[in-house]
């Protein structure tokens, strides 16, 4: 495994713990593509015997699962339980949920809440439209911030100097793949106060993103996704109006005072 640096606060990283986390993240990223022992050992650059021992430990504790032959590995059910506990314990998510319901009721479109995680956005809550099939996101999914309304709304809250160097991954022909193109788009986001994703993350889907400025810089955002086929100029203006109102309601809602922790 490559050498690891120091953790935050000057505390030296525990290699065994880091290896375990890297393995779980690798399996989670593979989704429905199970991995073989040698694949995992090669990916993390650790001896096959060490990887086997780690896998067996995690299988016994429910963090990793294996098939009936014992040769394929995937993420286990305890990862789901931990993720659910994260959502249930987060005061921001709990506070935002009723307003997502209101926006969904008013618009009949898909509404999301997401949080910036490095260069990605993690989806924390979704209200699906009853008018069309599922779009690109579900709770727990991560997408690169540069290719969606949620991510661009949050990137616009930060200086362009923090943007990573390109080229960026493209999901569609409309995705920004250069730092310069993304920065130009973010300048427009700052001017208008919300982001627009016109088929940059998924063909046929337009998104409108609104950063929630209860933190500085904003860590969370909400968005509305709508099929191009349903989007008229009048419909677009209605979506923007409702989502602006929703953002204002969320930002002016008093924070929880029942001993909730303010996480960083």
Language-model features, listed with the residues they occupy:
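Conserved segment of winged-helix/HTH DNA-binding domains
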Residues: 78-106, 134-135
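Short N-terminal helix-loop-first-beta-strand/juxtamembrane motif that initiates sensory/input modules
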Residues: 106-111, 191-194
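Short hydrophobic alpha-helical segments used for membrane anchoring or interfacial signaling
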Residues: 113-118, 126-127
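Short, solvent-exposed recognition segments
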Residues: 131-203
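Short, highly charged C-terminal tails/helix-capping segments
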Residues: 256-264
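Short amphipathic alpha-helical signal-transduction/dimerization elements
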Residues: 28, 151, 155, 159, ...
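N-terminal helix-turn-helix
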Residues: 2-89, 248-253
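Extended hydrophobic
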Residues: 175-247
């Amino acid at each position: 495994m490559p050498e690891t640096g120091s953790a935050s606060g000057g505390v030296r990283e525990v290699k065994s713990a880091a290896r375990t986390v890297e393995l779980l993240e690798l399996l989670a990223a593979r989704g429905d593509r199970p991995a073989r022992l040698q694949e995992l050992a090669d990916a993390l650059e650790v001896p096959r015997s060490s990887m086997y021992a780690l896998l067996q430990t995690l299988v016994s504790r429910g963090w990793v699962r294996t098939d009936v032959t014992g040769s394929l590995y995937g993420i286990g059910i305890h990862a789901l339980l931990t993720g659910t506990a994260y959502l249930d314990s987060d005061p921001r998510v709990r506070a935002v949920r009723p307003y997502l319901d209101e926006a969904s009721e008013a618009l009949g479109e898909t509404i999301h809440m997401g949080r910036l995680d490095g260069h990605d956005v993690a989806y924390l809550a979704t209200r699906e439209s009853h008018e069309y099939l599922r779009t690109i996101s579900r709770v727990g999914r991560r997408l690169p911030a540069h290719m969606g309304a949620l991510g661009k709304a949050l990137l616009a809250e930060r200086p362009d100097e923090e943007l990573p160097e390109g080229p960026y991954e493209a999901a569609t022909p409309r995705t920004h793949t250069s730092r310069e193109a993304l920065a130009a788009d973010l300048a427009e986001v700052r001017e208008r106060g919300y982001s627009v994703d016109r088929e940059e993350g998924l063909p046929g889907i337009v998104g409108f993103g609104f950063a929630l400025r209860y933190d500085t810089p904003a860590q969370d955002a909400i968005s509305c996704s709508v099929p191009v086929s349903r989007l008229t100029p009048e419909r677009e203006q209605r979506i923007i109006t409702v989502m602006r109102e929703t953002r204002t309601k969320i930002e002016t809602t008093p924070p929880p005072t029942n001993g909730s922790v303010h996480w960083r």
